[in-house]
Regions:
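ABC-family P-loop ATPase nucleotide-binding domain
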Residues: 1-10, 300-303
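ABC transporter nucleotide-binding domains
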Residues: 4, 11-205, 211
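A short, local hydrophobic-aromatic micro-motif
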Residues: 7, 20, 56, 245, ...
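Alpha-helix N-cap/helix-start and coil->helix boundary motif
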Residues: 10, 68, 91, 191, ...
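ABC transporter nucleotide-binding domain
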Residues: 172-258
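Short, charged/small-residue-rich alpha-helical element at the C-terminal edge
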Residues: 224-303
């Protein structure tokens, strides 16, 4: 079941088409990676979903209904350009933002207390935002995004400004929110986070959707029949099932070679031949990373 769908969305500016007939479907309770280089159109799509701007063609639907002002309460949005009121105290700021999202005074107080404790910020509740470090301010902005327990979280580069410890803390919170029922749309050009977090992804480049699907299916579709084998012995002879692309000596008598399967050859065929030639220590298929795929597509490779 898809919680959010964008159908044939186009957005034009005077001299530039920011989105060109983009369609995506985001499964309920997934972590969905909206990927693309800077300027690809990701933020434009996010702004349309948040009803900050309108699309020129196409439509967005949430929970099967055409996008409507009532859906704003279903969304928590953490923009890349963070914005907190510097002179306001942390607790007051969170209370103000919670009430904008429709929480009662009592419920807001309870949730603010819970989240400040959870992220280790209780003692900062009475301090002004300008007194916080960048990482602390990021945490406060994250709390403001999730306070009203929205069904859809849109996080635009959520890890910028975090050290590795706090980035992991936020990752854990994202997983927990997903497990409790939230759908997370995660917009980024940092591919290592995508590998760790996302179930499904869509790649936007130059205003168009280039590919989408589950992370596993996309990675499998970009496999190119390459294998890495660690072994003792020699692979100098000609082979019926594979070509040796390159070889390095790992230690003493242990070597590692990159193999390219010949057309139509299966892993079992290659492994059987290897076992007859050498003492195999490990044999692994090369699966491209999301980063490899991203670079390949954006720089004009396979699409």
């Amino acid at each position: 079941v898809n919680i959010l769908e964008a159908n044939n969305v186009t957005k034009n500016y005077a001299a530039h088409k920011a989105l060109d007939d983009v369609s995506i479907a985001i499964p309920k309770q997934s972590i969905f990676g909206l990927l693309g280089p800077n300027g690809a159109g990701k933020t434009t799509l996010i702004r349309i979903i948040n009803q900050i701007i309108m699309c020129d063609e196409g439509e967005i639907s949430i929970k099967g209904e055409k996008l409507h002002p009532k859906h704003i309460k279903d969304i928590g949005y953490l923009p890349e350009e963070r914005g907190l009121y510097k002179k306001m105290k942390v607790g007051e700021q969170l209370m103000y933002l919670a009430q904008l999202k429709g929480l009662s005074n009592a419920e807001a107080r309870k949730r603010i207390k819970h989240w400040l404790e959870k992220l280790g910020l209780t003692e900062w509740s009475g301090k002004k935002v300008e007194d916080l470090s960048k990482g602390m301010a990021q945490k406060i902005q994250f709390i403001a995004t999730v306070l009203h327990e929205p069904d859809i979280l849109i996080l635009d580069e959520p890890f910028s400004g975090f050290d590795p410890v706090n980035a992991n803390l936020i990752k854990d919170e994202i997983f927990e929110l997903r497990d409790k029922g939230a759908t997370v749309i995660f917009s980024t050009h940092r591919m290592e986070s995508v590998e760790q977090l996302c179930d499904d992804i869509a790649l936007i480049n130059k205003s168009q959707k280039i590919l989408d699907g589950t992370k596993r299916d996309i990675k499998n579709s970009f496999k190119s029949g390459k294998y890495v084998v660690n072994y003792k012995g020699s692979l100098n002879g000609l082979s019926t099932n594979f070509d040796v692309l390159d070889t390095t000596v790992v230690q003493d008598d242990l070597s590692e070679s990159m193999l390219q399967a010949k057309a139509g050859q299966l892993p079992n065929d290659i492994l059987k031949e290897l076992i007859n030639l050498i003492e195999v220590h490990s044999f692994v298929e090369v699966v491209p990373s999301i980063n490899d795929i991203f670079i390949d597509i954006v720089e004009g490779g396979k699409s």
